[in-house]
UniProtKB/Swiss-Prot annotation:
It comes from Methanopyrus kandleri (strain AV19 / DSM 6324 / JCM 9639 / NBRC 100938). This is F420-non-reducing hydrogenase vhu subunit U. Belongs to the [NiFe]/[NiFeSe] hydrogenase large subunit family. Residues 28-42 form a propeptide. Ni(2+) binds at residues 21, 24. It comes from the Archaea.
Amino acid sequence: MAEKRDVLNYLEMVIRSYDIULSCAAHVLDRVKFRIERKDED
């Protein structure tokens, strides 16, 4: 699962650096990452 988290972190970085208007998408990614981390704890 760490690989998926790394990919999401990379996507988030790309989105934020590419266009500030896409920060909403980055916010969605944050929520997805939170869900993935919660699953890892189970």
